[in-house]
Amino acid sequence: MRKYPFFYMNSFSCVPGYGNPAAVVYGAENISETDMQKIAKINGLSETAFIINEKTSGYDYRIKFFTPEKPINMCGHASIAAAYAYSEMNDMPCEISLTQKTDVGTLKIKVERLNEYSRASLQMDTPDIERTFHGQYKEFAQALGLKEEEIENDLPVAVNKKGYLYIPIKTIDSARRIKTNKELMLDMDKKLNLHGWYVFTPQVLLAENDFHVRFFAPSMGVDEDPVTGTANAYFSFYYYRYISAKPSGHLKNEQGFEIGKNGEIEVEFSELDA
């Protein structure tokens, strides 16, 4: 049986065991997608990334992502983990910029390997909002185990073009009391073509942060994701459209506290009005 280099990494935290874990398999050129899915299911993490080395001048490597249930086109925290693994396997400098090819295009990732921890950042486009819901919050609240009045009326519930649902709630107490109804969420996923539920409030646990976040993706086999890179990056467009009205800025969000995976993520956004 052939053996492959395997990495287990936590993104978005400097504390071991916190943040969002991802598995990375290096040199997966000869692993079939069927076997990739089996490996991801055995790992049981929200995502497993497979690095495929290809000789090309257009990018450094190709990557595929799998949840325990199905393949997905993109994953932020697993992209960061994969870039770090690639730099380690190829004995690259402590600071390096990489380009990875995904099923939805190429991503530019910067990796800084430091003594006590490492930093990584990736650049991506943010999808526009596709549709909004105003005052029609009963089913959303029921799916989260909340009362309808706990959802913020001054902001819309919105779905972007990638199928991410954004739900503003009033208080951090509501956020921490969420108890999802998985069956109802799955029904709404099918009805609205959703891929994930991003719930947020401006009330935070750590004063330096802007929003407290929780993210659920039951249709992807992820009951709750600890810290979600892609969803937080996409949130910047919602923030611009409905909260700040400024096309450039910075956000720092906290996530994962309810499941013991405390993490923080920073988002820089610009030219969202272009």
Residue ranges and their predicted role:
Residues M1-M74, I80-A274:
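Active-site proximal loop and beta-alpha junction motif in alpha/beta enzyme cores
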